UniProtKB/Swiss-Prot annotation:
This is Phosphogluconate dehydratase. The keyword Lyase applies. It holds the Pfam family ILVD_EDD_N. It comes from Helicobacter pylori (strain J99 / ATCC 700824) (Campylobacter pylori J99). [4Fe-4S] cluster binds at C154, C221. Gene3D superfamilies: IlvD/EDD C-terminal domain-like. GO terms for molecular function: 4 iron, 4 sulfur cluster binding; metal ion binding; phosphogluconate dehydratase activity. The gene is edd.
Length: 608
C-alpha cells in the first residue's frame, strides 16, 4: 500500500508537470545549446587555454582531453566553505590521472546566516540563492565544458548551485560537500546558554565563550539545520559520492571522497544532470526531508529546484509525503544528538536502506554512483571506509547503533514526517513539528502584533510579554523584505514557553533550520505584501494554531470581512521603495519580482 501511495503522488506530479518538463528537456538537449569548443574560433579557444599549463593547451583546445568546470563557493567567512580552498587542486590532480582537466569557471557568493541572523544583512539571504544560481550560469556560459563540479554546502548555496546547474542540465554534474565540523559543546547546552542570557542569568562574555565552544572549527554547524539538510538531499538525489555528506573535513577519508568525485566524472559514465533530476529524484529528496526531520527552508528551496527543471511541486505534495513517511531520526533541534552522532549510529545509509526495504523510496533513479551492474539508490545503502589508503564501500549497519537517535521504519519516532502544512482563514503555512513536544502543538491565545523583529526583542527585554500569546509578525515575506530568517525570536519565545506560557509565532517570514521547540506557523501565504490576511490581525484577536489537525485560524466573527490593520498602512504604501543600507537597495528588483513562498520565493520568474 505505501508503495502504491507513493506512486500515486508521483503520477500527480508527472501529469501536472507534463508540458513544463517536456519543454525543459527540449530546451536542455537542443543541439544549439550543447558544448561547442570544436566550433569556436581560434581566438576564442586561445582565450580558453591562455592560463593553462603549456603542455595542455593544444590537447584541450582541440578537445582531445575532457575539460570540466569547477563552480566553487569557497570563502573564509563560512566555516563549512573554508575547506573548499584546496578542492580544485585535488580535483585537477586526480583528473590528470584520467587524461582530463578542470578549470575554476566561477566563484559564487556564499553568506553565513549565522553571522547575519537578526540583523539587516539577513534580508539578502534568500535572494543570495538566486544570485548564486545566476553566477553559476555565468560561469558555465562559456559553453566549453564536458561536465561540472559544484563545491558548496550551506543554506542558500546548494539550492542556488543546483538551480544554476539545471540551466545547463546537458552537462554531467557532481556535487562535492565538505562535511560537518567535529562536535563541540552539545547543542542543547548552547541553546540553554542563549536562553539564560536572554533572561539575564549570564553575561555576554559567558555566552560568547559557550558560542565559541559550539562553532569552533571548519565544517558545517553540527545541528540538523538547512546546511546539513542540503547534504541529505544531495544524497537522496544521487548527486554526491555515496554517503560523503557527514564525513568531517579533516578526516583522511574526506580527501579520498573528493578524488572519487573526480574519478566518477572523468569516467564518462555519469549521465547529464537533466536525466538524473526528475520527479522521482525530487520526491526522494522530499522523502528524505520528512524521514529525517529536515529544515523548513526546503519547502521553498525544493520547490524552486523542481521548477528549474520543469517539475511542478507544491505544498500539497509535502503534506502527502509527510502523511506517508515516518520520522526515523532525532537530531538537534529535533533531539539532543548532532549529525556526527547520527552518522556514527548508521547515518543516511541506514535511513535509505530502511526506506527502500519498505517501499518508501524510489529505487529506480539514476545517480552518479551508477555502474554497469548496479543502478539506483541501492548504491547509497553502503558506507565508505579507508582500507590500505583505498576507498571501499561496505553495507550499512543492519540495525541502528543508537535508537535514541536513529530508528527503523518498524519502530519510528513518529508515524508521520517532520513537517506539516497548516490551512485556515489566514491562508497556508508551514510548521515543523518534529522538535515540538506534544503539549505545545496546539495553542489558542490572543494575538500580539509586531511591526518588526526588533520590537519583539525590545518588549521581551522589558518583560512585557510574560503571558500566553501568539506573536504575529507580518511583512517578512519575499516581496516585503526578502524573507529573512527570524531565528533570534526562538530563544526568547523558548524562554517564555519554559516559564509555562502558551506561546506561538505566526509570520510570512522564515525560521532557521535550527529552530524548532516553539510552534511557528511560517511562510504564511499569501504574504502581507500581497494583502494576505495576516495584515488584518489586531492585538487581542483570538488565534488557534492546531498542528495535529493542520489548522490555523483567527477565531473572530468579523475577521474575514475586516480591512487592513491601520498599523500596517504605511508599510504597505512604502513597499516599492528601496531599502537602503548593506546593499539592500541593489536587491529591490529581485524583491519586487519575487513569487510567493509556495512557488519557491524565486526572483527571476520561472513561469509554470
Amino acid at each position: 500500500m505505501p508503495k502504491h501511495s507513493l506512486e500515486q503522488i508521483k503520477e500527480k506530479i508527472t501529469e501536472r508537470s507534463k508540458k513544463t518538463r517536456e519543454l525543459y528537456l527540449e530546451n536542455t538537449f537542443n543541439p544549439k545549446n550543447q558544448p561547442k569548443i570544436e566550433s569556436l574560433g581560434c581566438a576564442n579557444i586561445a582565450h580558453v587555454t591562455a592560463s593553462m599549463p603549456e603542455h595542455l593547451k593544444m590537447p584541450l583546445g582541440s578537445h582531445k582531453r575532457k575539460h570540466f568546470a569547477i563552480i566553487t563557493a569557497y570563502n573564509d567567512m563560512l566555516s563549512a566553505h573554508q575547506p573548499f580552498k584546496n578542492y580544485p587542486d585535488l580535483i585537477k590532480k586526480e583528473l590528470q590521472e584520467h587524461n582530463a582537466y578542470a578549470s575554476v569557471a566561477s566563484g559564487v557568493p556564499a553568506m553565513c546566516d549565522g553571522i547575519t541572523q537578526g540583523y539587516e544583512g539577513m534580508e539578502l539571504s534568500l535572494f543570495s540563492r538566486d544570485v548564486i544560481a545566476l553566477s553559476t550560469a555565468v560561469g558555465l556560459s562559456h559553453n566549453v565544458f564536458d561536465g561540472a563540479f559544484f563545491l558548496g554546502v550551506c543554506d542558500k548555496i546548494v539550492p542556488g548551485l543546483l538551480i544554476g546547474a539545471l540551466s545547463f542540465g546537458n552537462l554531467a554534474s557532481v556535487f562535492v560537500p565538505s562535511g560537518p565540523m567535529v562536535s563541540g559543546i552539545e547543542n542543547y547546552k548552547k541553546a540553554k546558554a542563549r536562553q539564560d542570557f536572554a533572561m539575564g542569568k549570564i553575561n555576554r562574555e559567558e555566552l560568547l565563550k559557550v558560542e565559541m565552544q559550539s562553532y569552533h572549527d571548519v565544517g558545517t554547524c553540527t545541528f540538523y539545520g538547512t546546511a546539513n539538510s542540503n547534504q541529505m538531499m544531495m544524497e537522496f538525489m544521487g548527486l554526491h559520492v555515496a554517503n560523503s555528506s557527514f564525513i568531517n573535513p579533516n578526516n583522511p577519508l574526506r580527501k579520498v571522497l573528493v578524488e572519487e568525485s573526480a574519478k566518477r566524472l572523468a569516467s564518462g559514465k555519469v549521465l547529464p544532470l537533466a536525466k538524473l533530476i526528475d520527479e522521482k529524484s525530487i520526491l526522494n529528496a522530499l522523502i528524505g526531508l520528512m524521514a529525517t526531520g529536515g529544515s523548513t527552508n526546503h519547502t521553498l528551496h525544493l520547490i524552486a529546484i523542481a521548477r528549474s527543471c520543469g517539475v511542478i511541486l507544491n505544498w500539497d505534495d509535502f503534506d502527502a509525503i509527510s502523511n506517508l513517511i515516518p520520522l526515523l531520526a532525532k537530531v538537534y533541534p529535533n533531539g539532543s544528538a548532532d549529525v556526527n552522532a547520527f552518522e556514527a549510529c548508521g547515518g543516511l545509509a541506514f535511513v535509505i536502506k530502511e526506506l527502500l526495504k519498505e517501499g518508501l523510496l524510489f529505487e529506480d533513479t539514476h545517480t552518479i554512483m551508477d555502474t554497469e551492474t548496479q543502478k539506483g539508490m541501492q548504491n547509497y545503502t553502503k558506507t565508505p571506509f579507508l582500507e590500505n589508503d583505498q576507498l571501499v564501500y561496505k553495507d550499512a549497519v543492519s540495525h541502528s547503533l543508537n535508537t535514541d537517535i536513529l530508528r527503523p521504519v518498524s519502530e519510528p519516532f513518529a508515524a508521520n514526517g517532520g513537517l506539516k502544512i497548516l490551512k485556515g482563514n489566514l491562508g497556508r503555512a508551514v510548521i515543523k513539528i518534529s522538535a515540538i513536544k506534544d503539549e505545545h502543538r496546539k495553542v489558542k491565545a490572543r494575538a500580539i502584533v509586531f511591526k518588526t523583529q526588533s520590537e519583539f526583542l525590545e518588549r521581551f527585554k522589558n518583560k512585557e510579554l510574560e503571558r500566553d500569546f501568539v506573536a504575529v509578525l507580518p511583512f517578512q515575506g519575499p516581496k516585503s523584505n526578502g524573507m529573512p530568517e527570524l531565528h533570534k525570536l526562538t530563544t526568547n519565545l523558548g524562554a517564555l514557553q519554559d516559564m509555562g506560557y502558551k506561546v506561538a509565532l505566526v509570520t510570512d517570514g522564515r525560521m532557521s533550520g535550527a529552530s524548532g521547540k516553539v510552534p511557528s506557523a511560517i511562510h504564511l501565504s499569501p504574504e502581507g505584501a500581497l494583502n494576505g490576511a495576516i495584515i488584518k490581525i489586531k492585538d487581542g484577536d483570538l488565534i488557534e494554531l492546531d498542528a495535529p489537525n493542520n489548522a490555523l485560524n483567527v477565531l473572530e466573527k468579523d475577521f474575514e470581512k475586516r480591512g487592513i490593520n491601520p498599523l500596517f498602512l504605511e508599510t504597505l504604501e512604502n513597499l516599492e521603495k528601496p531599502t537602503f543600507g548593506l546593499g539592500r537597495e541593489l536587491f529591490t528588483s529581485l524583491r519586487l519580482n519575487a513569487n510567493t513562498a509556495e512557488e519557491g520565493g524565486m526572483s527571476f520568474g520561472i513561469k509554470v
